[in-house]
């Protein structure tokens, strides 16, 4: 599949543009540094797909036709947390570490973003052998794959974006792990209960998730909620408290916060 890559100078705060994309239901983007160290926004449009309305007045600094394979060439293997590597190139072959093979496609979440790193950090810290895990808003599937390789007995990964589901399914096959990936609008298609629910999405969507999360958890379950901008942390905490969840641990990188929660 061919895409048009458009590059814009980043004129607003990162969290502001991420929120805007999620509001518009647009997921094919990345925020990176260019060769001069300046933050830029990259978006990827399928053939014939229009430019999102809120970007029509933005200056385009570069434009080219590209494919997912082109993006993988630009990525190198890296250690996302101690002992866990992400490898978009399939260059790593080691038995003393967990290696996640990744074809990013155009779904958000290669492991480079702080919210993904913090999520994997807490999965590694709290996941026990044999736990069941639900990944809500799975994107590339990186958290679901990490959970399975860290010892989860059952992993379900869901996303509302059909292309994210396709990318996650491809990555699950690439890693040869048993993870069920399916479409779901938050928990609409999810059945059963899980020991850990991990979700790397926006604060406003966490608030909606918390309305129904008790249905898919039990008394000893744990929530790992990431993708929260620090100024909206209290909003998530209040909603969690309303439904019987308290913060067990908190981690922050730049303006991004990840919360680990248990039932009160």
Swiss-Prot record:
Catalytic activity reported: L-lysyl-[protein] + 3 S-adenosyl-L-methionine = N(6),N(6),N(6)-trimethyl-L-lysyl-[protein] + 3 S-adenosyl-L-homocysteine + 3 H(+)
Positions of S-adenosyl-L-methionine binding: 116, 137, 159, 200
Predominant location: cytoplasm
Location within or outside the cell: Cytoplasm
Keywords annotated in UniProt: Cytoplasm, Methyltransferase, S-adenosyl-L-methionine, Transferase
GO BP: methylation
Coiled-coil stretches noted in the UniProt entry, renumbered to this chain: none
Classification via InterPro entries: Ribosomal_L11_MeTrfase_PrmA, Ribosomal_PrmA_MeTrfase, SAM-dependent_MTases_sf
Gene Ontology molecular function, alphabetical: protein-lysine N-methyltransferase activity
Enzyme Commission no: 2.1.1.-
Gene Ontology cellular component list: cytoplasm
Family statement drawn from the similarity comment of this UniProt entry: Belongs to the methyltransferase superfamily. PrmA family.
HAMAP family listed in its UniProt record: Methyltr_PrmA
Function: Methylates ribosomal protein L11.
Protein name in the entry: Ribosomal protein L11 methyltransferase
Organism of derivation: Thermotoga petrophila (strain ATCC BAA-488 / DSM 13995 / JCM 10881 / RKU-1)
Gene: prmA
């Amino acid at each position: 599949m061919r895409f048009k890559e458009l590059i814009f100078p980043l004129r607003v705060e990162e969290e502001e543009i991420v929120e805007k994309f999620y509001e518009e239901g647009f997921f094919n983007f990345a925020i990176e540094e260019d060769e001069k160290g300046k933050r830029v926004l990259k978006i990827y449009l399928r053939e014939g797909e229009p430019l999102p309305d809120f970007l029509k007045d933005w200056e385009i600094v570069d434009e080219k036709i590209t494919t997912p394979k082109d993006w993988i060439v630009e990525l190198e293997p890296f250690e996302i947390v101690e002992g866990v590597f992400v490898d978009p190139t399939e260059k790593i072959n080691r038995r003393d570490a967990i290696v996640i093979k990744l074809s990013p496609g155009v779904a958000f979440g290669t492991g480079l973003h702080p919210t993904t790193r913090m999520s994997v950090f807490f999965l590694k810290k709290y996941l026990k052998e044999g736990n069941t895990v639900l990944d809500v808003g799975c994107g590339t599937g990186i958290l679901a794959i990490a959970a399975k390789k860290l010892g989860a007995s059952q992993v379900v990964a869901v996303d509302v974006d059909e292309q994210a589901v396709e990318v996650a399914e491809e990555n699950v096959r690439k890693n040869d792990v048993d993870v069920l990936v399916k479409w779901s609008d938050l928990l609409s298609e999810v059945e059963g209960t899980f020991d850990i629910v991990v979700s790397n999405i926006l604060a406003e969507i966490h608030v909606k998730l918390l309305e129904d999360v008790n249905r898919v958890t039990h008394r000893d379950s744990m929530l790992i909620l990431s993708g929260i901008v620090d100024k909206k942390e209290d909003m998530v905490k209040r909603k969690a408290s309303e439904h019987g969840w308290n913060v067990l641990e908190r981690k922050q990188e730049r303006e991004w916060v990840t919360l680990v929660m248990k039932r009160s």
